[in-house]
Structures are given as C-alpha cells and as structure tokens.
Amino acid sequence: MGPRRKPQTPRRRPSSPAPGPSRQSSSVGSQTLRRRQKFMWLKEIKTLQKSTDLLFRKKPFSMVVREICEKFSRGVDFWWQAQALLALQEAAEAFLIHLFEDAYLLSLHAGRVTLFPKDIQLTRRIRGFEGGLP
C-alpha cells in the first residue's frame, strides 16, 4: 500500500478590501477593461458588416420553415430543396436587417441610442402591411 495523503485543511480566503473609497489603481484597471470590451464590440460589428455570411444557422432556420409550412398546409409535408431554403433564408435576413436599420434610425430621431420594441413597431406601422424591402 502506498503512502497516505494528509487531509487538507480549508485555507482562509484573503480578506476583502475595506469599505470606503477605492484605490486609484483598481479604477484605472476597470477603465482599461471597459475600453478593451468596447473595442471588442466594435471589432465584432465591423467584421459582421464586412462579411456576407448568413447570420442564422441553417438547421434551426430550416426547422422553423418546415414547421410554418406544415402549419399553413394543414399537415401536408413538403420537400424543400437546399437552394430554396437558402434563398428564403437570405431574403429573411435581408428583411430583418433592413427592419432593424430603419428602427434604429427612428430611435436616433427620438434622441436615444437604445433600440426599443416601440421603434420596431413604429417601423412596421410606417411601412404598412406589405412593407418589404425598398
């Protein structure tokens, strides 16, 4: 039989900083972290704007399309070609991107930076019933 290990005693955690004004170094560190996170967001936005890739994954989108098709065709199952699903997905993404662009313009017009549901609702109301792409 090999040597036995001694049971480890729980170690004490380091004491938390005293309440009161924080030190200058911690605020500087949090500012650089925020700045780094901001640049990461901006970098992600720029890469997404440059790319022409699809934003939705293909499998979940095809499942939603099949479910909607089954609902409106009263249980009749249709076969979908891959090219047809791809064309439908590109059209759906273009529609949503254009909708969000217009809704964001409305939020900027209202003097806000945050996009609210009421901006999207107003965009759809301005566009009308069949407010597709221009």
From Swiss-Prot:
The modified positions for N,N,N-trimethylglycine read G2
Extract the ranges annotated as region (Important for flexibility of DNA ends that protrude from nucleosomes).
34-48
Post-translational changes noted in the entry: Poly-ADP-ribosylated by PARP1.
Query: Where are the stretches annotated Disordered?
Result: 1-34
One example of a Gene Ontology biological process annotation? establishment of mitotic spindle orientation
Q: Where is the composition biased (Basic residues)?
A: 1-14
The family database entries (Gene3D superfamilies) matched by this protein are listed as: Histone, subunit A
CDD domains per record: HFD_H3
Region of interest (H3-like), ranges: 35-134
Q: Name one GO molecular function term.
A: DNA binding
**Ranges in coiled-coil conformation:** none
Q: Any idea where this protein resides?
A: Nucleus; Chromosome, Centromere
List-wise, which residues carry Phosphoserine?
Answer: S16, S22, S62
Q: Name one GO cellular component term.
A: CENP-A containing chromatin
Keyword list (alphabetical) reads: ADP-ribosylation, Centromere, Chromosome, DNA-binding, Methylation, Nucleosome core, Nucleus, Phosphoprotein
* Cited Pfam families: Histone
Tell me, what does this protein do in biology? Histone H3-like nucleosomal protein that is specifically found in centromeric nucleosomes. Replaces conventional H3 in the nucleosome core of centromeric chromatin that serves as an assembly site for the inner kinetochore. The presence of CENPA subtly modifies the nucleosome structure and the way DNA is wrapped around the nucleosome and gives rise to protruding DNA ends that are less well-ordered and rigid compared to nucleosomes containing histone H3. May serve as an epigenetic mark that propagates centromere identity through replication and cell division.
Q: Name the family.
A: Belongs to the histone H3 family.
Q: How does it assemble?
A: Component of centromeric nucleosomes, where DNA is wrapped around a histone octamer core. The octamer contains two molecules each of H2A, H2B, CENPA and H4 assembled in one CENPA-H4 heterotetramer and two H2A-H2B heterodimers. CENPA modulates the DNA-binding characteristics of nucleosomes so that protruding DNA ends have higher flexibility than in nucleosomes containing conventional histone H3. Inhibits binding of histone H1 to nucleosomes, since histone H1 binds preferentially to rigid DNA linkers that protrude from nucleosomes.
Q: What is known of its domains?
A: The CATD (CENPA targeting domain) region is responsible for the more compact structure of nucleosomes containing CENPA. It is necessary and sufficient to mediate the localization into centromeres.
What name does the UniProt record give this protein? Histone H3-like centromeric protein A
Record the organism: Mus musculus
The organism's taxonomic lineage, starting at the top: Eukaryota, Metazoa, Chordata, Craniata, Vertebrata
Gene transcribed to yield this protein:
Cenpa
